[in-house]
Structures are given as C-alpha cells and as structure tokens.
C-alpha cells in the first residue's frame, strides 16, 4: 500500500494530500530511509514522521483499504513519540 494512503486510512494523518505534502518535504522515513508518498509499505515496516517539533515512530501492524475510526489505531503500534528542538 502507498505510504500516503496508509497514513490516511490509519488516521495518523487526516488527509492523503497532507500526507503527500509531508512526505514530499522530507519529513517521513520508512525503515530509516527517506520516503516519498508513493513508497510501498509492508507489515512490520517502521515509519518515522516529523510533525513540527514532534517525532513519531510507528510500526505497521496491518494493511486495510478502509477502516472505521474506532479500528484505525489497531493498524499501527506507537514505538516512540518525542519532542525535538526546531533548528532556528
């Protein structure tokens, strides 16, 4: 499944277009490698996402084409969530 679609379906990022923008700005890594929005994700991949001053590391547990809001959190496991200083 494409990275941008997974982030939207799992509700880590609310809209696919926003997921694409974040990836295109170089703020997402998959298994430690800089990723594009079209990167193909697989179960057990680790995705690192930088949201402003927050760094989120999640492990992909499940792939679904669509899901209910209540079930979305079961698609991934949060490994770490840290605050990072902005380089000014």
Swiss-Prot record:
Disulfide partners: none
Entry keyword set: Protein biosynthesis, RNA-binding, rRNA-binding, tRNA-binding
Keyword S-adenosyl-L-methionine: no
CDD domains reported for this sequence: S4 (cd00165)
An individual GO BP term: translation
Molecular function GO terms recorded: rRNA binding; tRNA binding
Residue runs in coiled coils: none
Cleaved signal peptide residues: none
Keyword Lipid biosynthesis attributed: no
S4 RNA-binding domain residues: 1-60
Self-association state and partner proteins as the record states: Associates with stalled 50S ribosomal subunits. Binds to RqcH, 23S rRNA and the P-site tRNA. Does not require RqcH for association with 50S subunits.
Family, as annotated: Belongs to the RqcP family.
Function: Key component of the ribosome quality control system (RQC), a ribosome-associated complex that mediates the extraction of incompletely synthesized nascent chains from stalled ribosomes and their subsequent degradation. RqcH recruits Ala-charged tRNA, and with RqcP directs the elongation of stalled nascent chains on 50S ribosomal subunits, leading to non-templated C-terminal alanine extensions (Ala tail). The Ala tail promotes nascent chain degradation. RqcP is associated with the translocation-like movement of the peptidyl-tRNA from the A-site into the P-site.
Protein name: RQC P-site tRNA stabilizing factor
Lineage: Bacteria, Bacillati, Bacillota, Bacilli, Lactobacillales
Recorded name of the encoding gene: rqcP
């Amino acid at each position: 499944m494409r990275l941008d679609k997974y982030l939207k379906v799992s509700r880590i990022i609310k809209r696919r277009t926003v997921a694409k923008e974040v990836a295109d700005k170089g703020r997402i890594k998959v298994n430690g490698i800089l990723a594009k929005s079209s990167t193909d994700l697989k179960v057990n991949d680790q995705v690192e996402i930088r949201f402003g001053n927050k760094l989120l590391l999640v492990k992909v547990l499940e792939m679904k084409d669509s899901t209910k809001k209540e079930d979305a959190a079961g698609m991934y496991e949060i490994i770490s969530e840290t605050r990072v200083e902005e380089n000014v």
